[in-house]
C-alpha cells in the first residue's frame, strides 16, 4: 500500500477490506453507509481529552464472548498510553473478571426498563468525551436482545444502547 494515500482513501480501503469476505453480510450494510467511518472514529478518539467509555461484552451461554473484550482491552491500553481515561462499561460476569485490573463501570443485567434513566445518570456522572461500543448486542424494536441464531439473550445482557443514544459527545 502506498505511503501517499490520503487519510480518506486509507479509511475507505480499510473499511472495504473489513467487509469483503465477511460471512455475515456486512458488505450489504457497508454499501448503505457513508464512507470514512473509520477515519471519523479515529478522529473522535484522538480529540477526546478525558474520559472514553468503552462498552463491551456479549452474553454467550451464561458467560461472555471473548473477541470483543480483548479488542476493548487493547483499545483501553492504547487510550491510556495517549493520556486519556478509558472506562470499560460492561455487565457481569465480564465486569467481575475485569474490575480488579481495569477501570470499569458496571451495567445492571436484565434491567432494560430502567436502562435509559440509568444511562443518563451514568453519563452525567462519568462526563465522557467519547462513547464507543465493541461487540455489544443492540436492542430490537421490542426492546429485546437476540444473538445471530435468533435466541433471546435479554436476561443475560446489560443495556449499553442508551449510553450511545443519549451521549452528549461523539459516539462510535
PLM features per residue range, with description:
Residues 98-165:
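An acidic, phosphate/nucleotide-engaging active-site surface
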Residues 50, 129-130, 169:
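Conserved acidic residues
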Residues 55-56, 133-137, 172:
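Short beta-strand segments
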Residues 65-83:
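Histidine-anchored nucleotide/phosphate-binding helix
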Residues 83-84, 167-172:
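A short helix->loop->beta-strand "cap" motif at the edges of active sites that frequently abuts
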Residues 84-91:
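Short internal beta-strands
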Residues 29-33, 54, 58-70:
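Short, glycine-rich nucleotide/cofactor-binding loops
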